[in-house]
Swiss-Prot record:
<keyword id="KW-0206">Cytoskeleton</keyword>
<dbReference type="Pfam" id="PF03953">
    <property type="entry name" value="Tubulin_C"/>
</dbReference>
<dbReference type="InterPro" id="IPR013838">
    <property type="entry name" value="Beta-tubulin_BS"/>
</dbReference>
<feature type="binding site">
    <location>
        <position position="144"/>
    </location>
    <ligand>
        <name>GTP</name>
    </ligand>
</feature>
<keyword id="KW-0460">Magnesium</keyword>
<feature type="region of interest" description="Disordered">
    <location>
        <begin position="428"/>
        <end position="448"/>
    </location>
</feature>
<feature type="compositionally biased region" description="Acidic residues">
    <location>
        <begin position="430"/>
        <end position="448"/>
    </location>
</feature>
<dbReference type="GO" id="GO:0005525">
    <property type="term" value="F:GTP binding"/>
</dbReference>
<keyword id="KW-0963">Cytoplasm</keyword>
<keyword id="KW-0493">Microtubule</keyword>
<comment type="subunit">
    <text>Dimer of alpha and beta chains. A typical microtubule is a hollow water-filled tube with an outer diameter of 25 nm and an inner diameter of 15 nM. Alpha-beta heterodimers associate head-to-tail to form protofilaments running lengthwise along the microtubule wall with the beta-tubulin subunit facing the microtubule plus end conferring a structural polarity. Microtubules usually have 13 protofilaments but different protofilament numbers can be found in some organisms and specialized cells.</text>
</comment>
<dbReference type="InterPro" id="IPR003008">
    <property type="entry name" value="Tubulin_FtsZ_GTPase"/>
</dbReference>
<dbReference type="InterPro" id="IPR018316">
    <property type="entry name" value="Tubulin/FtsZ_2-layer-sand-dom"/>
</dbReference>
<protein>
    <recommendedName>
        <fullName>Tubulin beta-1 chain</fullName>
    </recommendedName>
</protein>
<feature type="binding site">
    <location>
        <position position="11"/>
    </location>
    <ligand>
        <name>GTP</name>
    </ligand>
</feature>
<feature type="binding site">
    <location>
        <position position="142"/>
    </location>
    <ligand>
        <name>GTP</name>
    </ligand>
</feature>
<keyword id="KW-0342">GTP-binding</keyword>
Amino acid sequence: MREIVHIQAGQCGNQIGSKFWEVISDEHGVDPTGSYHGDSDLQLERINVYYSEASGGKYVPRCVLVDLEPGTMDSVRAGPFGQLFRPDNFVFGQSGAGNNWAKGHYTEGAELVESVLDVIRKECESCDCLQGFQMCHSLGGGTGSGMGTLLISKMREEFPDRIMNTFSVMPSPKVSDTVVEPYNATLSIHQLVENTDETFCIDNEALYDICFRTLKLTNPTYGDLNHLVSATMSGVTTCLRFPGQLNADLRKLAVNMVPFPRLHFFMPGFAPLTSRGSQQYRVLTVAELTQQMFDAKNMMAACDPRHGRYLTVAAMFRGRMSMKEVDDQMLNAQNKNSSYFVEWIPNNVKTAVCDIPPRGLKMSVTFMGNTTAIQEIFKRVSEQFTVMFRRKAFLHWYTGEGMDEMEFTEAESNMNDLVSEYQQYQEAGIGDDEEEDEEGVMGEEIDA
């Protein structure tokens, strides 16, 4: 069946990734030793999307763990599901990337990349019909961003026709872990624009907001944030793993979501978000789910969808529900907010429904929006980048690893192009072929 090979790179990627494996192992009834203790045949029907079966009926994740320092790997191995992974699939260096994209992409990471590719090839060979890859990484650090993008471009060469899907943690506007985040992120986005099919932009700040406002957690930990991310990740692939009335896979998703090849940065969301204590006091309706799903408070990227327009949207519903009601509510949402959808893509909402809800909920929905508002993230990073790059601050760390200033300039202009592409489609109407016409039309209106 349609397998997905999961790769997690760097500290952030490994922490989110291991949380994700806890969530889907729970959904499939796989315990920390890899044995199945489920209660339904549905859990096993398509378990081989993410797991391969080893001798003795053990299920082993199709997962490759990569880092340039051993620390995070050790904590994954010592964590609750650490014994689940194939020991050979931990590939790590000793030196660390030190939050330096150039180390991850050109020096330290480049030395390790062949051994990682070997492990990835092994995983792919055990697949029956590989659908694609998903990678978890952050764009602010050194390994996930530098080495992560290096791996993506190498895998693109080797598996050109497979889907490349990334869950990328963007630098946050207020919460910064590293001073050189804007550099690392810009260099990474420069790569992602060219080499991935779908990128889910996740943002720590948006996750913090969800934890504070909606989940009412007074001091959220990274564990809480990662829990939100893994809920989204599990939702995106539900349709592959469980039977449903309307199935979607990564390729269908890409075909429906990406109107222009460069604009494949999605804003994920999840509903219902209820605080852990208050779950049992509510019963959810499809209408409430749909309303919550389009709410800016539920978005996992720190940009406001009301500042842009949706090019396309996909919604993955989970749980037993009436298809008619889902269709009605989705239509209703589009009609009510029609000004937030571009009118030159009719029916730009794709819906999928899967019968199995996540643990602890009767029904839920995972939201993916390809909105022009995502340019806010890129604009923010770009501004920070420009301020530092103008003074050539911190550049010696990168040029010392053999990078050229030209590469920074290219990455910067590529990102600015991306922003203006989003802006252009945000303003485009049905009748305009060119932007000049648009200004002309505006002018006529004023005369009239």
